[in-house]
């Protein structure tokens, strides 16, 4: 591909040079003054001061000393007739001698005929020239593009505010000689070959043309075997048909190979160049070039007998043509170096002409342009009170809506309106007292083409004819008497018109009109311009200034362009891009960026070059690991058996990754590491055989290069992995497969040399022997790391900078990067041109400025931040400029944006190097860090450039100050040279940001016990827990967190076993309320019951308990409960933590013991006590952590656990019966009913006796306890509605030493 591109570039340069050399107008000394010696009659103007005319040549001092119009306004102009078509390369101006009259800005127009003027354009826009600042100074302008014309017109735009318009002018250039032939739409010019067939491997065809119509054949040639070449004008665009494949398809049914140009029927000159070498071709119309490849079996174009210009004559039928002929003029036709028109003028035998002229005669058609949608109009008089009406004209526009014609009819006939409505013509005749007439015809008439309209009203019949289609006009036969009026308003209505002379129910027309006829009489629009007929406002007379803003198409990445008269719009649907010109990718550039924005694992589209030309590619991002793996699948990752193959008939498999090789290369080059797993199985099938001989099996990688090394080997060394491990099956071989044994062997490992990846093809040639077999498996492409997201440098002095090649951003420029600094100001980057420039800087601690000049004055965007930007935190900047708008974005602050003016579609021309972190003057440089610099989506390697410069160091620390908050759930931010990472050691979660919950399913017998003894290692290195719990410590601050999901109530969630038989248990009561039960002293126990919904509802709930001194807070989901301890109550030394069922029941509180029989059935996640994560230790570090697991513990996400999953876990029910009727919020189990009536009766009897005994004991203990409890400190009194729920619980084992209390909150 690269070689082809280089060939095309060289070819284009060479052929373009030959083409320009062939033009007879070429003159390297084309700068002679052309107006100095002209007769005064060669100058003409819109008006003259006091009716006196003074020759306006440069340095003229006689008479009035130059030209001034009678009135200084925007409608004045000065015109020069240069006698013949000349080439104009420069202009100069002065003010009027001895006066205060001079022009400060002006425009140029040129023409061949003195009519149908063309405005001079530069940078694809109507150019405004800078004029004078005094009367005597000469301001000279060299034209970027020369003009070829006979007439030149200077149009003043602005002038000295203390004087009037005054000009003396000069035009520089040289004579222009050309060969012209004119076609009248019925003629052709034939160039016949000296031999029967002209067979060419390369062709160069160039010409210029001026067309009077939108359709016609410029030239055509064909061969008998089917080759042909045709250039045809179709609806104002040039279509090229070129075929070398020998097919004999008819020209009328095949599609053109290329279509270029637009509005080419404007009666102006347009250039065409076709260059072909074999199947490669360049097609250029004016300055727009399209490269394409021709289909075909050969490289030669075979044309028989002749080339025809102007039409396609039918053989043996004189005067008959296959398609519509060309009507217009063609200039300087060169076919492979042969001047065709020169041969015709000299009447050489190769030329056969039919009714052609060697001059360019064109009708004097005067177009007009309506430029303003609010105030443009043209008033023309008519002959009133004629019975009937006749109006016709041509129009062209891009707007869907606009008033074309409004006239008040005589004799009370009403008002006639012709409107362009939604691209259709709508004729209305409105009457006050009766129903009027409405005719609608046509569609999509806002296509920019010329359309003819004719309105005729005669004998109660109204006819609307569109595009001369007299066979099917739109009719209305209403009984209406129509009498013509005396005023016809075209395009709009005057602002000061208050009566019904002109009605406009829609906005004014913007577009061009010509050939206006009223009552079958043509209207002289030059007379209107001179003020001798009619009136007008905001018109350009004698030119049509329509512009195709969609050519070239500035909508990038396949965006669809639509336009109106003043601007264009881009439809970016289904492109993967957004923005005014579809420039900005909607996708991120790597999985690392997706991770940084909080996304989890899944399929994503990655756009490696952002706004660059490469499209997005679908990948899988595994964002659950510390290394963010990006996986690109291909079309065959399964184990595949090799068919019979040998050296003559090799087996080959090609891999398709769903994207282009350029996309894959960009993805790989932007990654830190890439690999593909390769496994090759073999039995009596060689792989390499020898390290220096031809291999039997190889693979194709990047750039279509062949590779002979395999997994684990060094690139370009023909070996396999077993050589380095010294375990090959045959020590004489370099691969296991080369042992050539009858048993299966394999080679497996990873290919990881990025410059060779991905694997695009595998070829095998040794499976044709007896019992010879082979199979392979090529894994997907996997990469991790983003080389550019953390690519950072530090600028240490104001004079330091990095320089890069010139930023080429003529039509679109986007710049993005991160920065952090403590400086007050500094320039981030700067790029200069001759006049153009762009600069991005921090102008103050809270202001970012983006300044850009594309030749029409600087545009400055400013964002003021409400917070300081020099806070040594990372901040993001993105600046963009395109043909529609300029914008600046800082962090998430509101964007600053400015739309481009209607004519400000200028190219940005930069010539200097791009300075990053400073300026060319080495002043006002940036001090601080910058990273991830992207220019038009392209990654810029700051680190590599910094290695070559002083005052700039690679890398930048301090990422955690900005991104430390991304480490969630207790994770710790760890600085790295390129970015940061989250240490999840002290977090119950895991993952890149410690956001992935570690969760597991429990059944009724599952128990996870964490013993608090000595500190333990949680990873394979020597890192210890940052806050380990020692056996003899008693922290004053405690935190317990867990998430749970269950459908079982009552149940036990967590149990903390302290010394001296103290405990804390988290339970669910019978009705699903949360209960916290604990005993933290020898004298009392506490039970807190939260009045919440039933938490055993199969949904995930979160519990967080904090104890800070005497204050206890319990957060249940979004509800917060608080309680104050007695200051003397403290947590004692913790011995163990149990999740699920408590297996060591000795000394277990009786109430807790009853619930413990059931265990826990459900899911627990994110369990944490202070810095200890017991569930994480059980699942991830069971071999080294002091944790034991009994029963079945199944790792599973709680969010993905269904009710059926929870219910499916085995549940054990208690056989104990509660003592008496208890509150449902108490943590007691339900009685299990027996199916046997006998057993039920026995149990009932035993229960009755037991109740009697317990009743006597309760009475005795109550009296004893009351005397003891009166000495205890009184707790907080609760309201009366809770007093009934408050009661003392009884500890059957420690009745003499405990006062147990329960609270409902």
From Swiss-Prot:
Q: Which of the residues are on side Extracellular?
A: 25-1237
Q: Tell whether Endoplasmic reticulum is among the UniProt keywords.
A: no
Function, please? May play a role in the correct development and proper functioning of the peripheral and central nervous system and be involved in cell adhesion and intercellular communication.
Q: What is this protein called?
A: Contactin-associated protein like 5-4
Enumerate the Cytoplasmic topological stretches: 1259-1305
Taken from the UniProt entry, a GO cellular component term is:
membrane
* One BP term from GO: cell adhesion
Q: Where is the Fibrinogen C-terminal domain?
A: 584-790
Glycosylation: residue positions: 282, 496, 571, 622, 1057
Origin organism of this chain?
A: Rattus norvegicus (Rat)
In the UniProt record, what gene is named as encoding this protein?
Cntnap5d
Q: How does it sit in the membrane?
A: Single-pass type I membrane protein
Q: Which UniProt keywords apply?
A: Cell adhesion, Disulfide bond, EGF-like domain, Glycoprotein, Membrane, Repeat, Signal, Transmembrane, Transmembrane helix
């Amino acid at each position: 591909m690269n070689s082809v591109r280089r060939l095309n570039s060289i070819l284009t340069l060479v052929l373009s040079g030959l083409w320009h050399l062939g033009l007879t107008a070429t003159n390297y000394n084309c700068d002679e003054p052309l107006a100095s010696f002209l007769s005064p009659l060669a100058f003409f103007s819109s008006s003259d001061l006091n009716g006196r005319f003074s020759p306006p040549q440069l340095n003229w001092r006689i008479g009035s000393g130059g030209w001034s119009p009678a009135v200084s306004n925007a409608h004045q102009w000065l015109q020069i007739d240069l006698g013949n078509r000349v080439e104009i390369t420069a202009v100069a101006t002065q003010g009027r001698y001895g006066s205060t009259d001079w022009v400060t800005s002006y425009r140029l127009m040129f023409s061949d005929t003195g009519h149908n003027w063309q405005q001079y354009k530069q940078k694809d826009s109507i150019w405004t020239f800078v004029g004078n600042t005094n009367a005597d100074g000469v301001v000279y302008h060299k034209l970027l593009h020369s003009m070829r014309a006979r007439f030149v017109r200077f149009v003043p735009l602005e002038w000295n505010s203390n004087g009037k318009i005054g000009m003396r002018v000069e035009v520089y250039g040289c004579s222009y000689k050309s060969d012209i032939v004119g076609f009248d739409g019925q003629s052709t010019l034939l160039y016949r070959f000296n031999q029967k067939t002209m067979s060419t491997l390369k062709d160069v065809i160039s010409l210029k043309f001026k067309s009077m119509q939108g359709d016609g054949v410029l030239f055509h040639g064909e061969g008998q075997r089917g080759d042909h070449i045709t250039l045809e004008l179709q609806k104002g665009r040039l279509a090229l048909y070129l075929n070398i494949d020998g097919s004999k398809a008819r020209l009328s049914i095949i599609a053109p190979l290329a279509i270029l140009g637009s509005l080419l029927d404007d009666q102006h000159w347009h250039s065409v160049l076709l260059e072909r070498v074999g199947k490669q071709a360049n097609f250029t119309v004016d300055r727009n070039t399209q490269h394409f490849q021709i289909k075909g079996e050969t490289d030669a174009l075979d044309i028989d007998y002749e080339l025809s210009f102007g039409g396609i004559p039918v053989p043996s039928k004189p005067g008959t043509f296959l398609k519509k002929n060309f009507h217009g003029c063609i200039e300087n036709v060169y076919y492979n170096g042969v001047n065709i028109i020169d041969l015709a003028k000299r009447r050489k035998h190769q030329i056969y002409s039919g009714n052609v002229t060697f001059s360019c005669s064109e009708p004097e058609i005067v177009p007009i342009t309506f430029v303003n949608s609010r105030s443009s109009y043209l008033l023309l008089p008519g002959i009133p009170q004629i019975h009937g009406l006749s109006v016709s004209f041509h129009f062209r526009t891009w707007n869907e809506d606009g008033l074309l014609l409004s006239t008040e009819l005589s004799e009370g006939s009403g008002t006639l309106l012709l409107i362009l409505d939604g691209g259709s013509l709508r004729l209305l005749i409105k009457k006050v007292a009766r129903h009027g007439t409405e005719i609608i015809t046509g569609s999509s008439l806002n296509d920019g083409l010329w359309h003819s309209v004719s309105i005729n009203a005669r004998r109660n019949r109204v006819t609307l004819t569109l595009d001369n289609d007299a066979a099917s006009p739109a009719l209305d036969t209403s009984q209406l008497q129509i009498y013509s009026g005396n005023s016809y308003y075209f395009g709009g209505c005057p602002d000061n018109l208050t009566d019904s002379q002109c009605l406009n129910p829609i906005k004014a027309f913007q577009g061009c009109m010509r050939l206006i006829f009223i009552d079958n009489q043509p209207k002289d629009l030059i007379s209107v311009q001179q003020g001798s007929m009619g009136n007008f406002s905001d018109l350009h007379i004698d030119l049509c200034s329509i512009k195709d803003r969609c050519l070239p198409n500035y909508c990038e990445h396949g965006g669809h362009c639509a336009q109106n008269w003043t601007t264009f719009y881009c439809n970016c649907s289904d492109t993967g891009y957004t923005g005014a010109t579809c420039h900005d990718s909607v996708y991120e550039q790597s999985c690392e960026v997706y991770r940084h924005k909080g996304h989890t694992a899944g399929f994503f589209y990655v756009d490696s070059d952002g706004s660059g030309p490469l499209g997005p590619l679908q990948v899988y991002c595994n964002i659950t690991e510390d290394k963010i793996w990006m996986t690109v699948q291909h079309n065959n990752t399964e184990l595949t058996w090799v068919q019979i193959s040998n050296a003559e008939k090799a087996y080959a498999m090609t891999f398709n990754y769903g994207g282009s090789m350029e996309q894959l290369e960009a993805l790989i080059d932007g990654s830190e590491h890439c690999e593909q797993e390769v496994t090759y199985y073999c039995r009596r099938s060689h792989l390499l055989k020898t390290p220096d001989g031809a291999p039997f099996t190889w693979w194709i990688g990047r750039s279509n290069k062949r590779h002979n090394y395999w997994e684990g080997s060094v690139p370009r060394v023909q070996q396999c992995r077993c050589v380095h491990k010294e375990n090959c099956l045959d020590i004489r071989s370099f691969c296991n497969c080369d042992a050539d044994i009858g048993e299966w062997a394999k080679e497996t490992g990873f290919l990881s040399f990025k410059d060779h990846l991905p694997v695009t093809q595998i070829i095998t040639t040794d499976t044709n022997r007896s019992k010879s077999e082979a199979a392979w498996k090529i894994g997907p492409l996997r990469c991790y790391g983003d080389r550019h997201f953390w690519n950072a440098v530090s600028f240490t002095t104001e004079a330091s900078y990095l320089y890069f090649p010139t930023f080429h951003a003529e039509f679109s420029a986007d710049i993005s990067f991160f920065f952090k600094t403590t400086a007050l100001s500094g320039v981030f980057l700067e790029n200069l041109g001759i006049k153009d420039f762009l600069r991005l800087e921090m102008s103050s601690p809270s202001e970012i400025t983006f300044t850009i000049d594309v030749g029409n004055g600087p545009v400055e965007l400013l964002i003021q931040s409400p917070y300081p930007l020099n806070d040594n935190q990372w901040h993001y900047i993105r600046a963009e400029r395109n043909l529609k708008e300029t914008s600046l974005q800082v962090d998430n602050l509101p964007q600053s944006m400015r739309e481009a003016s209607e004519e400000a579609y200028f190219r940005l021309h930069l010539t200097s190097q791009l300075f990053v972190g400073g300026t060319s003057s080495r002043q006002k440089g940036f001090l601080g860090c910058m990273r991830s610099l992207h220019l038009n989506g392209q990654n810029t390697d700051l680190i590599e450039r910094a290695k070559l410069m002083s005052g700039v160091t690679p890398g930048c620390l301090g990422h955690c100050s900005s991104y430390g908050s991304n480490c969630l759930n207790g994770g710790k931010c760890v600085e790295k040279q390129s970015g940061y990472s989250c240490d999840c050691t002290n977090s119950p979660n895991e993952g890149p940001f410690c956001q992935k919950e570690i969760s597991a399913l429990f059944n009724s017998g599952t128990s996870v016990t964490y013993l608090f003894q000595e500190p333990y290692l949680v990873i394979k290195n020597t890192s210890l827990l940052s806050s380990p719990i020692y056996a003899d410590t008693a922290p004053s601050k405690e935190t317990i967190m867990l998430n749970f999901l269950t459908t079982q109530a009552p149940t036990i969630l967590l149990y903390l076993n302290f010394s001296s038989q103290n405990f804390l248990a988290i339970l669910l009561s019978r009705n699903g309320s949360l209960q916290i039960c604990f005993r933290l002293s020898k004298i009392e126990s506490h039970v807190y019951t939260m009045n919440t919904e039933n938490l055993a509802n199969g949904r995930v709930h979160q519990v967080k308990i904090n104890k800070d001194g005497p204050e206890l807070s319990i957060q249940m989901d979004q509800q917060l409960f608080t309680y104050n301890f007695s200051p003397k109550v403290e947590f004692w030394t913790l011995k163990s933590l149990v999740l699920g069922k408590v297996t060591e029941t000795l000394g277990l509180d009786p109430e807790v013991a009853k619930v413990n029989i059931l265990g826990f059935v459900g899911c627990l996640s994110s369990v944490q006590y202070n810095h200890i994560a017991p569930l994480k230790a059980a699942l991830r570090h069971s071999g080294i952590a002091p944790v034991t697991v009994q029963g079945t513990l199944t790792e599973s996400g709680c969010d993905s656990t269904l009710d059926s999953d929870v219910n499916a876990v085995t549940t054990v029910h208690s056989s104990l019966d509660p003592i008496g009727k208890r509150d449902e919020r108490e943590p007691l189990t339900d009685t299990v009913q027996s199916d046997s009536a006998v057993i039920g009766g026995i149990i009932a009897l035993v229960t009755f006796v037991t109740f009697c005994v317990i009743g006597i004991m309760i009475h005795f203990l109550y009296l004893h306890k009351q005397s003891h409890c009166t000495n205890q400190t009184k707790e907080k009194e609760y309201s009366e509605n809770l007093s009934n729920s408050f009661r003392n619980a009884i500890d059957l084992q420690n009745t003499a030493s405990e006062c147990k209390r329960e609270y409902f909150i």
